[in-house]
UniProtKB/Swiss-Prot annotation:
Protein name: ATP-dependent RNA helicase dbp10
Gene behind this protein: dbp10
Biological process, per Gene Ontology: rRNA processing
CDD domains, alphabetized: DEADc_DDX54, SF2_C_DEAD
Organism: Aspergillus oryzae (strain ATCC 42149 / RIB 40)
Matching PANTHER family: ATP-DEPENDENT RNA HELICASE RHLE-RELATED (PTHR47959), RNA HELICASE (PTHR47959:SF8)
Sequence similarity: Belongs to the DEAD box helicase family. DDX54/DBP10 subfamily.
Hydrolase listed as a keyword: yes
Compositionally biased region (Polar residues): 20-35
Length: 929
């Protein structure tokens, strides 16, 4: 075969080997690349690919590897059996048993995901783990695989050994399914305890000595109190979706459950984010935990380009529409995937049409790959999500939505529509998007600017992955300017406002701020105004969203004081309202001047108050009382302003003096002054203790300049600088600390590692988190007094509350005596205690009781007669014939509904008596003579 040129052209059959180089791009990290287990492959046709003059054997190995990858790309591991599937891949190196490896292969897993690769070895070592992973990243298998490996088989000793707590019924069912599939080949017993199921059935399940309990916190605590369960046998505890557990108000239940667990347990906590409440819970319930998170969770991609638009509050909806229409160029109407689905649905024959199960995308052949229109919009509250969803639907876009309190099934459908391409826009809150593993996006729009820099990183981290370009667009109001400046300090990037630097801006390295073009923005705002006038539902949604925004503004975190001061100067500058450099090619110099004039008119603030204007128009003289009052107020304000300016000039003078000293030092270096002879004598290997101290050393050692108060403070200070340990950090450069705080979370010290990973998200409907202050009393209209709000929040309104073992308040209805009544009804004696051997008699009694309780359908009914006028006539006719055949083929006994021919002794005695009476009657002589 002739030599082929070494070019970046696509290989034969359009085969992409990047999948072999980078496993799972969406969750990639800085770990070492996975080692592929070599297996004998079929010999590929020899190809001369001698790029660097290597040996022919190496080239043949590469060709065989590519051929094997190409062959495996066209098959699905879950559909193959036997030795055709790769046995476990990286799972083999984790020391798992053969049954578990076979179950993993049968499940379709070939290579562990990044979160599995990081957590499973640590869990196998017996350490407590706090793992940060989104839904869809394989975290369920990350804690189920080590659990099955540790438990191995069913224990004859009484007591559950594994406990998995999930926030919802759906997630618990999903976890049970994974446990069942990976537990094949073992005799481990697993039970599901969720709300809505029968308590009596769950009593029997817990009495059957299960090994693994998968439950929701509320129902498990109910059973713990009702059955007086002893949890001392539990060795493996998992809090799945822990942040959602606290968000849903399970903090008291988790505290009570945690109190009853033994101290020698292994505790795992998996969460999408790490709020402060969860950090406190982990410190209290986990022993020296290890924080594991991926680098993609904490870094902004260098390929991400950020754009910040300065807008007014009344123009936010119009700005969003302008970005979608003019910047992203998003089309309206149904998407290509929706049209393809409709065409495939219309082309099918009705007779051969088979109903597709929800979530089965094979019939449509969707590809969860991003398009240039895939956009996610972040809003503050769920009311904003509803409002924006209705507004964008009215504009003709294909939209999906999700928020925290949305039903689990509805949220799954909405997110799946976005992943499959049935919608181009997904409107979400931070709480809802926190645990969703969304594929790589093209654009992210921050409709409401985040209150923390880490939330911004969490939002935009979903785009610009795997070497792809991505854009983020943020709408910044005047009130959001301090938060934007905090973000700029956090990222350590240059701030560019308007066109002050001309065309020399880099959206990937700078924080570039500017306004939208006035013409397009005005058109979009007019359309929004028209829609609000015509659509009463959308108008009411906007009113509700406005009320929710007021509450959101009161509860969000405050920006730093320095950023708030800087924001006043930034917002008041002319460049704040200048057209963004992104629109450089959209207008001439005349158009720019027009934009500046309109911006000045829009930002005009009169110098006179309403009192002065009113008096001047009515021709009144200056001696009026209102004018005198305004003059006195203005004089006071001017005096304070001058005093503040003098203080700023003094601080600038001090800074100039310090910078001048640095400049002199730099000049000395530049002039090439010769060093002293003593310095030349110092060898390279000897440390130079007399070298110039760094700024950080000076900052730690010496206090900063504080004007004239320094002498007074030092004289009155009681601190001995040699022995005194301050409670504040020695470094006061908060911006530098924050910037360096974004690092990988594999530190051994959980306190230090969690400090950079902690991120509090405001609830999208005011949900209370763990250990947050709350209103303890409320006004009862009926009894005309204040009553405790505790009963309203824990779902036990109108019931008594009692103290649990940990001191937390729980509903007294948890101890209702239903378990004792059930045990007496089943005629069960003393229940075995934890640590005792389970008795076969108890298992037999439980199985018998369960069989006796469950109704078994034994009655057979004849099918309905076939109707010739119905479409299922042939089907019903066959059913009837089959039922007749079953009746005729029964051997022994009567047909269904027939009378039994077996007679009892009473029946025989009665029959004999009647027969004797008939005989006596017939034996009488005839009356006729």
């Amino acid at each position: 075969m002739p030599h082929r040129a070494a070019s970046p052209a696509a290989s034969e059959n359009e085969f992409d080997i990047t999948n072999a180089l980078f496993q799972n791009d969406s969750d990639s990290d800085n770990d070492t690349s996975l080692k592929q287990t070599k297996r004998p492959q079929k010999a590929a046709p020899p190809q001369a690919l001698d790029f660097l003059g290597g040996d022919i054997d190496d080239d043949e190995d590469d060709e065989a590897f590519i051929a094997g990858q190409q062959a495996s790309a066209n098959r699905k591991a879950s559909n193959l059996k036997g030795r055709t599937v790769k046995k476990g891949g990286g799972f083999q190196a984790m020391g798992l048993n053969a049954h578990l490896l076979k179950a993993i292969t049968r499940k379709g897993f070939s290579v562990p995901t990044p979160i599995q690769r990081k957590t499973i070895p640590v869990i196998m070592d017996g350490q407590d783990v706090v793992g940060m992973a989104r839904t869809g990243s394989g975290k369920t298998a990350a804690f189920v695989i080590p659990m099955i490996e540790k438990l191995k088989s069913h224990s004859t000793k009484v007591g559950a050994r594994g406990l998995i707590l999930s926030p919802s019924r759906e997630l618990a069912l999903q976890t049970l399914k994974v446990v069942k599939e990976l537990g094949k080949g073992t005799d481990l017993k697993s039970v599901l305890l969720v709300g809505g199921d029968s308590l009596e059935e769950q009593f029997s399940l817990m009495a059957g000595n299960p090994d693994i309990v998968i439950a929701t916190p509320g129902r498990f605590l109910h059973l713990k109190v009702e059955m007086n369960l002893d949890l001392s046998s539990i060795r493996y505890v998992v809090f799945d979706e822990a942040d959602r557990l606290f968000e849903m108000g399970f903090a008291d239940q988790l505290t009570e459950i945690l109190y009853g667990l033994p101290a020698n347990r292994q505790t795992l906590l998996f969460s999408a984010t790490l709020p402060k409440s969860l950090v406190e819970f982990a410190r209290a319930g986990l022993q020296e935990p290890t924080l594991i998170r991926l680098d993609t969770e904490s870094k902004i991609s260098p390929d991400l380009e950020n754009v910040f638009f300065s807008v007014k509050s009344s123009e936010k909806e119009g700005a969003l529409l302008h970005i979608l229409h003019e910047v992203i160029k998003m089309p309206t109407g149904p998407t290509e995937a929706a049209q393809r689905q409709k065409e495939q649905g219309d082309g099918k024959n009705f007779k051969n049409f088979k109903k597709r199960k929800r979530g089965d995308d094979k019939a449509i052949n969707f590809q969860e790959s991003p398009t240039k229109y895939s956009t996610i919009v972040f809003a503050a509250t769920k009311h904003h999500v509803d409002y924006l969803y209705s507004l964008l639907r009215e504009a003709g876009f294909a939209v999906s939505y999700a928020y925290g309190s949305l039903d689990q099934t509805a949220r799954k459908i909405q997110v799946q529509n976005f992943r499959a391409g049935l919608s181009n826009i997904l409107v979400v809150t931070d709480v809802a998007a926190r645990g969703i593993d969304i594929p790589i996006l093209a654009n992210v729009i921050n409709y409401d600017f985040p209150s923390q820099p880490k939330i911004f990183v969490h939002r935009v981290g979903r785009t610009a992955r795997a070497g792809r370009k991505g854009w983020s667009y943020s709408l910044v109001r005047d009130a959001d300017a301090p938060y934007m400046l905090d973000l700029q300090l956090f990222l350590g990037r240059r701030l560019v406002i308007g066109r002050e630097h001309g065309d020399q801006v880099n959206f990937a390295e700078d924080v570039v701020v500017g306004s939208l073009p006035r013409d397009g923005l005005s058109t979009s705002c007019e359309w929004v105004t028209k829609v609000l006038e015509n659509e009463a539902d959308i108008y009411s949604q906007r009113t509700i969203a406005g009320k929710g925004e007021k509450l959101y503004m009161r509860t969000r975190n405050s920006a730093s004081l320095e950023s708030a001061k800087r924001a006043k100067q930034v917002v008041s500058s002319d460049n704040w309202t200048a057209v963004h450099p992104l629109f450089n090619d959209q207008g001439s110099q005349m158009e720019l001047e027009r934009e500046k004039m309109l911006a000045r008119i829009g930002g005009y603030r009169p110098q006179e108050t309403i009192f002065e204007v009113h008096n001047r128009r009515n021709g009144k003289h200056e001696g009026d009382e209102a004018i005198d009052t305004i003059k006195r107020i203005r004089t006071t304000v001017d005096y304070k302003k001058k005093k503040r300016e003098m203080a700023e000039k003094q601080s600038d003078f001090v800074e100039d003096a310090s910078s001048g000293n640095k400049g002199e030092a730099n000049e000395t270096e530049e002039t090439g002054a010769q060093p002293d002879e003593d310095e030349e004598d110092i060898g390279e290997g000897v440390p130079d203790n007399m070298s110039m101290a760094s700024e950080s050393d000076l900052e730690v050692t010496f206090s900063s300049y504080n004007g004239g108060k320094a002498k007074k403070d030092s004289a009155a200070s009681f601190q001995n600088p040699e022995y005194f340990m301050s409670y504040t950090p020695s470094s006061t450069n908060l911006a530098e600390d924050r910037a360096y705080g974004v690092h990988t979370g594999t530190n051994a010290n959980f306190t230090q590692a969690s400090r950079s990973a902690t991120m509090d998200l405001l609830g999208d409907e005011g949900a209370r988190g763990f250990a947050e202050p709350r209103t303890m009393m409320r006004w009862d209209k009926r009894h005309k007094k204040y009553v405790s709000r505790q009963n309203d929040e824990d779902g036990s309104k109108g019931t008594h509350l009692v103290k649990g073992e940990s001191g937390a308040k729980i509903a007294s209805t948890f101890r209702s005596g239903r378990f004792d009544a059930w045990r007496k009804g089943k005629r069960l004696g003393r229940m075995p205690r934890v640590g005792e051997e389970e008795t076969p008699a108890l298992v037999h009694d439980l199985n018998t009781a369960m069989r006796r309780r469950r109704f078994q359908h034994r009655k057979e009914q004849a099918p309905k007669a076939a109707d010739r006028l119905r479409g299922d006539y042939e089907k019903m006719k066959k059913k009837g014939e089959a039922a007749k055949q079953r009746q005729l083929s029964k051997a022994g006994g009567a047909a269904a509904g027939g009378k039994s021919e077996l007679k009892s002794t009473d029946d025989i005695r009665l029959a004999r008596k009647l027969k004797q009476q008939r005989r006596e009657k017939n034996a009488r002589p005839s009356r006729k003579k």
